[in-house]
C-alpha cells in the first residue's frame, strides 16, 4: 500500500531494471523523506463502502486521488449519506423498515444476536444524520420470485437452479445490503451471488436482480 502511494506521489521515479519492487520502494521512500525533495503529486486515499452511499451492496474499495503539487489543490472525500446504525434503528427500534414493506409483526424475524447491544444503544438516540443502508429487500422486492413465477415478461430475470450454501459462501441475507457481487463467465456466478431467504434457503440472484444490486 505504501509503495502504491509513493509511486503515485513520485511518478517520475520509475523502476530501474533489474531493480526489485522492494528496492524501488526504498529509493522512493528515501527520495520522499529528503527535505529538499517535494512530491510531484499530492495523493489522498480513503477506504469507501458503496453501502454508505445508498447502494444496496457492501462493496469496499480504496480510492486514490492525486493532484499536481504545484496546483495547491485540497481534496475532500464525500461524507457518507447512509449508515448501518440508521438501518438498525429503522428495523429494530422504530420498525419503519417493516412497515414500508408491509410485513406484519408476526412475520418479522427476531433481531440477530450480534446486533442486540447496538439496538439498545440506538434506542436512546432520536436523530440520525444519515439514511438507512439500502437492503436486498429494498432493491428487489418488487420483482416476482423467478423460482415460482416464470411468465413475467421481465428481461434477464430467469431462475438459475443449483444454488447451495457452504462454509464461507452463505449468500446475502434479504434484510441487509448484499455482499460484494463478483463477475463470472456464466451469467451470475455462485458463491456470494446468492440470496439467503429468512428460512435459510438459498437461490442465485438473477441477472436483473444483480443489476439492481
Task: Indicate where each model-derived feature is located.
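Class I S-adenosyl-L-methionine
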Residues: 1-174
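Generic structural motif recognizing short loop/turn segments at the entrances and edges of beta-strands
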Residues: 39-41, 71-73, 177, 191-193, ...
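A broadly conserved detector of short glycine/acidic/proline-rich loop/turn motifs that flank catalytic sites
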Residues: 68, 185-187, 209
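Internal, well-ordered alpha-helical scaffold/interface segments
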Residues: 138-141, 179, 211
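Internal helical hairpin/lid segments
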Residues: 161-195
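Low-complexity, glycine/alanine/valine/leucine- and proline-rich hydrophobic stretches
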Residues: 195-213
